[in-house]
Every structure is written in C-alpha cells, then in structure tokens.
C-alpha cells in the first residue's frame, strides 16, 4: 500500500497486523466473470487480442523482463532530481494526481510520461532496458471500506477509462523509449482487505454495472471527437483553446506538442471530464464487446480485458497482501508451520473470484509485506517504535523464509486455473533499509536512522559479524522489547530476534536469491510510497542510506546476478 503514517497508526492499531490482507475462505466456486447464457449474451471481442496472452518468456519470468532476478525501485520520474546513471531494471510509481486512483476523476497522465522519460534516460545512460511500472487503483480500500468506486457509475466509468488509457499509452509510447512496453500493478490492498475484514458476503452481493461502463469506455477510447471550442477543452494558465480533432490519444499528443507534460495532463483530464464523457454517455451500448457478469468477478475480468485489449504487450499484475486473513500479518512470526494454513485461505479467496483463472488473466501476482522499513527510526515522537510494535514489520531470517514459502505455495496453488506450472511472482514495496552497524553514522541528508533486514537477507553484508554484536546501538534502543504478537521473537530485542536462528547476516552467497528464484520470483521492487528506504533517496518519499543499497545492487549486477529457474 501507499504508506500514510496517520492512516497506518489508526488503522493497524485496530487490525493488529500489516494494513491489509486476504481471505477466510471463498465459499463455493463462482462464475469467472464472463457472462453466460444464463446472465447476458456472449459476444466476440471486436479489437481484442487473443484472450490467452503468452505469459511466459524464454526464461522462467515473463515477457520483456530479464532472465535473471530483476531489481527495481520507487521513483517519481523526475530526471532533474533522481539518479539517472544507476543500473536498474524497473522503476515504479503511483498513477494520477493523488496516487489513490483519483476516485471520481479522470487521472492526469503526466506521471506515465514522466516515468517513460525517466526509464528512457536511465537506459540511455546505462545501456540497459528499464521497465516503467505504474500502480493503478480501480477500487481504493487502503483507507477502509467503501463501495463508491464500483457502485457509482460515474466513478466506475472513469476508473475503467483511466486503466484503458494507461494500458494504451504504455503500449504505444513505452517500447521505443525504454525497450519494454511497461507493467501495470493493479489494485494494491483490495483483495487483501476483503479477506482481512471478512467482506466476502458484502462483495458477493454487489451489483456492478460492468458492461455499460466498458461500452462507454470503448467509445471514449476509440471515437473521434471535435475538440474545437468544446466545453472545458483549454490548456495553460491563459485558457488557450484546444484546436484539434481526433481520439483521446490524438488529444494528449496534441497537448504535449503545445506545453509541458504536467500542463498537458491537466488539460487532458479537464477536457475528457467536461466533454468526452458526456459525448459517450448518450451512445447506445456496444453489444459487440465481450459481456461480463454484473458482479465482482465480472468487474475483475473487465479490467483484465481492458489491459489485454488496449495494451496487449503490457504486463499486468494483481496484488495480494501478507495480512489477508483476520489475524493480519502476524502469522509470519509464528514459524514455518504457519505458512500453509495462511496460503490455503488466500488461495480460496483468489479462486472464488477467478482472479487468475478467468477468461482474461493477468500475467503475474505481486506481494508486499508493508511499505515501511522494519524500524523507521527517522520518524519523530517515537513513531518508529509505535509502527514496529503495531505492524509486525521487524523480520528475521525465518520470517523471510516464511514469506518466500508463501509466495511459492500460492504461485503453484494457482497453476491449474492459470494454465501454467506456476504464476510468476513480483515482490513489491520491499523496504531497502539494512541492518546498520556502529561504524555507520547517522547524518542528516546522508544516512537516516532506518533499520531493515530484507537486503541483508538476500544479499548479505560483510560488515556484519556473525553474532551481530556490532549492530548499531540505536536499533535495540528504538525498537524496544518485541510484544507478544511477535511469536517466536516475543519478548526479545531486535538483535536477539535477528540472531535467534544463528543466520549469517554477513554472508556473500546467493542462497537466498536462489530461494527467491525457486519461489518463482522474477523481480524485487524496493522502496514504497513513504517511510521506507529505496535504491536511491527521494525527498519526502524514501530515506537516504549513504549509497548502501545502490552499491549493493552494483555489486549484484557485476558479480552475482541470479538466474531464474
């Protein structure tokens, strides 16, 4: 999820685990979201590619991603303020103005173009393709239960248009610039929230007018419009009139030729909102489009279809939390026997809604654990300790072993409906803070007081000795004694928890990178929307670490690239 500290402390003090989650069982088998003769007529897609996309590349990953375990980071797509010579395989950001799907609004697309440009610049400087990943919310449940995103028809149409336009833009603009067609990360926290809060009955009762919305979106995406003197169709501060005709894609290209990406995006959103939507609202329904069931399953299928149709070479992933059961994310601290019971509940939820077994399938599943460092010591007023005690964020080696075993079991458990041996896995928003030593000094703007174990687990850090007796003193002081929900680590300090299993955090081998590949992980994207370290520091988004993570990845690319299986 995109982190917000006030939201974190308020919500997770209640749920007692990582913010969102997933299932307590899905009940009986559900329709896969395609309308049948018992619901509404089935039609053949008019412009869609084959319903079964090729989801496997020549490697064990997916198309246009490397044949080794890829690495990525959060970015704002700003070449003026972020490094552009750091080797990286992928960058990600949240689409729209507010990063939450902009409910009820046409999203401004300027971030899409900024990310494509950022990836292009890094590719030019490093010589390697960079995959721009865009997070797209169609239903934002990170902040709690609401149904307006799917039951308010205006919201529904705008969300689906935003997704279709994102897919189309990546399809047509990304490849020449970046060497890939990009990736869409769909609906963080949605499925996890449903399972965590046991909302399946509420979800199953929803009547979502999917077909009318898809028909209107098809009109908005394909019709030609006369934008001359159209209401709301102006650009720049002085409201210059838009003087062009064509599709919405022609509109944004015309605007980009007149002004900067940000101003063009604002003008595009206003024009589509004020004019294009109204032109298509009165159009008769297009019955030549695929027909979907008017429920949650049909809504899922409609999103997959729109990406397949408008971005046939764009990769698509659906998200799952590790807190997808009523107990939240604390299960990960209960030892290896806690994995399979959790997995079984998640698989029940995913199968109930045919997320990976419908006619239109995503390309991969992506997991996060929570968008904050294990101990966010940089937060004021002891908020870092509140976070680590409320959010189950402090991980030792057994916790990461459990995490990878979870991904492997879910990936393989979805195989039958997916039609392949497993569903490829992305690890997303993994915090890049490391276990700091006493030799590392906290300096404002250079190195923040953040602690995390993920990079040390996967890559190791030769600066750490086997007993961790050189761990920075402020880590144990800041974390305090871990509470009873920490299971095997309950009552321990941070360093005691980290050394509980005698794991060598100073290793320099690829054993855990291989374990990730064995769990069908094709990429790890580092950093998050707030309170997490990333590959590089972004003011207000990610913390500085004196170049530790960037140097670690440089060594990985030079000496240790992990092949996929």
Model-identified regions with their sequence ranges:
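Aromatic-lined carbohydrate-recognition surfaces of secreted/lumenal glycan-active proteins
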Residues: 187, 296-339, 367, 419-435
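C-terminal motif of bacterial Sec signal peptides marking the signal peptidase cleavage site
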Residues: 19-22
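N-terminal carbohydrate-binding/catalytic regions of secreted carbohydrate-active enzymes
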Residues: 64-173, 504, 509-511, 532
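Bacterial signal peptide processing site
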Residues: 24-27
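Substrate-binding cleft of secreted/luminal carbohydrate-active enzymes
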Residues: 58, 62-77, 353-565
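Substrate-binding cleft and catalytic face of glycoside hydrolase catalytic domains
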Residues: 95-99, 114-155, 182-206, 214-225, ...
């Amino acid at each position: 999820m995109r982190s917000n500290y006030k939201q974190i402390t308020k919500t997770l003090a209640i749920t007692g685990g990582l913010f969102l989650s997933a299932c307590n069982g899905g009940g009986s088998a559900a329709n896969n979201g395609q309308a049948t003769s018992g619901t509404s007529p089935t039609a053949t897609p008019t412009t869609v590619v084959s319903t079964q996309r090729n989801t496997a590349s020549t490697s064990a990953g997916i198309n246009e991603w490397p044949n080794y375990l890829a690495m990525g980071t959060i970015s704002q797509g700003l070449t003026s303020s972020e490094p552009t010579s750091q080797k990286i395989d992928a960058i990600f950001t949240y689409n729209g103005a507010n990063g939450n799907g902009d409910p009820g609004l046409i999203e401004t697309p300027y971030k899409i173009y900024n990310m494509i440009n950022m990836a292009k610049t890094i590719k030019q400087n490093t010589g390697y393709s960079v995959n721009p990943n865009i997070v797209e919310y169609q239903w934002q449940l990170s902040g709690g239960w609401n149904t307006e995103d799917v039951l308010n028809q205006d919201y529904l149409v705008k969300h689906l248009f935003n997704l279709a336009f994102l897919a189309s833009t990546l399809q047509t603009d990304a490849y020449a610039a970046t060497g890939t067609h990009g990736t869409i990360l769909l609906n963080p926290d949605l499925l996890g929230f449903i399972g965590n809060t046991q909302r399946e009955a509420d979800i199953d009762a929803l009547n979502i007018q999917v077909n009318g919305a898809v028909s209107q979106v098809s009109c908005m995406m394909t019709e030609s419009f006369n934008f001359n003197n159209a209401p709301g169709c102006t650009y720049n501060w002085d409201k210059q009139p838009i003087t062009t005709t064509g599709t919405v894609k022609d509109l944004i290209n015309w605007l980009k030729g007149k002004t900067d990406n940000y101003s063009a995006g604002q003008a595009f959103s206003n024009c589509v909102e004020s004019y294009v939507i109204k032109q298509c609202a009165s159009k008769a329904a297009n019955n030549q489009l695929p027909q979907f069931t008017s429920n949650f399953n049909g809504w899922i299928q409609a999103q997959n279809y729109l990406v397949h149709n408008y971005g046939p070479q764009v990769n698509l992933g659906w998200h799952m939390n590790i807190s997808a059961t009523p107990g939240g994310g604390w299960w990960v601290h209960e030892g290896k026997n806690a994995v399979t019971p959790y997995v079984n509940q998640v698989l029940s939820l995913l199968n109930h809604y045919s997320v990976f077994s419908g006619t239109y399938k995503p390309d991969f599943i992506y997991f996060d654990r929570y968008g904050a460092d294990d101990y966010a010591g940089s937060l004021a007023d002891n908020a870092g300790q509140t976070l680590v005690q409320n959010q189950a964020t402090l991980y030792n080696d057994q916790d990461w072993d459990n995490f990878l075993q979870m991904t492997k079991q879910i990936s393989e458990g979805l195989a039958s409906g997916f039609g392949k041996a497993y569903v490829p896995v992305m690890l997303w928003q993994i915090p890049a803070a490391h276990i700091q030593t006493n030799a590392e000094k906290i300096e404002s703007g250079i190195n923040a007081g953040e602690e995390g174990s993920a990079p040390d687990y996967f890559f190791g850090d030769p600066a750490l000795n086997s007993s961790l007796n050189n761990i920075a003193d402020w880590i144990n002081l800041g974390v305090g004694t871990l509470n009873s929900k920490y299971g095997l680590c309950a009552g321990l300090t941070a360093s005691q928890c980290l050394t509980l299993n005698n794991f060598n955090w100073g290793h320099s081998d690829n054993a855990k990178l291989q374990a990730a590949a064995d769990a069908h992980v094709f990429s790890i994207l580092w950093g998050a929307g707030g309170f997490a370290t990333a590959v590089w520091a972004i003011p207000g988004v990610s913390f500085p670490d004196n170049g530790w993570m960037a140097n670690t990845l440089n060594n990985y690319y030079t000496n240790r690239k992990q092949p996929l299986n």
